[in-house]
């Protein structure tokens, strides 16, 4: 094996993007990443709430009325630090591996803004990046055997595979 990459869908896309941006050293950095309708940011107005709450918790879990002013401020700061760290568009740098993002413009679960932010950060840091936004398909399309061939992305499945194959051939 010459290269090892990561792939993730939805919250798994956040995990794959975390591996691509929060790695410890060059030996733990993937060589490329494939992100499919990924959760990227923890910003409340854009994130997927379930992923956010499972990863960093809710504000009410961090701060409440029973705290001293000092402890309230400390916890609120720690909460915001975690949100910043796990808003992966803020963690991209020139060493982030080449990335392809694939999603649908009508995703009603993970806002498209997640992928747009990550893609723009990749470009700003001169990281090789590709993004494919299909006009429909919603969220959660994929390759389950129960609806393969009749799911919401059927019309684009060939394009999806072509995009990934082209991306992989360039790595």
Predicted regions and their residues:
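Mobile cap/lid helix-loop segments that gate and shape the active-site cleft of serine hydrolases
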Residues: 39, 43-91, 97
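Residues at alpha-helix caps and immediate loop-helix transition turns in enzyme cores, especially N-
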Residues: 47-48, 111-115
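C-terminal catalytic histidine-bearing segment of alpha/beta-hydrolase fold enzymes
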Residues: 102, 113-171
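Primarily recognizes the serine-hydrolase "nucleophile elbow" in alpha/beta-hydrolase
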Residues: 1-51
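Acidic catalytic loop of the alpha/beta-hydrolase fold
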Residues: 42, 106-110
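Serine-hydrolase-like catalytic core of hydrolytic proteins
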Residues: 1-2, 110-111, 121
């Amino acid at each position: 094996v010459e290269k090892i990459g990561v792939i993730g869908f939805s919250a798994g896309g956040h995990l794959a993007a975390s591996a691509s941006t929060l790695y410890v050293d060059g030996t733990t950095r993937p060589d490329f990443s494939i992100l499919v309708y990924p959760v990227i940011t923890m910003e409340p107005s854009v994130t997927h709430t379930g992923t956010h709450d499972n990863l960093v918790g809710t504000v009410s879990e961090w701060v409440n009325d029973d705290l001293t002013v000092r402890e309230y401020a400390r916890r609120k700061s720690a909460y915001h630090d975690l949100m910043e760290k796990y808003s992966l568009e803020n963690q991209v740098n020139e060493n982030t591996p080449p990335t392809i993002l694939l999603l649908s413009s009508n995703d009603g679960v993970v806002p498209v803004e997640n992928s747009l932010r990550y893609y723009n950060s990749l470009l700003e840091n001169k990281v090789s990046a590709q993004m494919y936004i299909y006009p429909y398909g919603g969220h959660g399309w994929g390759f389950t055997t129960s609806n393969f061939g009749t799911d919401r992305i059927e019309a684009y499945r060939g394009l999806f595979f072509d995009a990934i194959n082209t991306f992989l051939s360039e790595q």
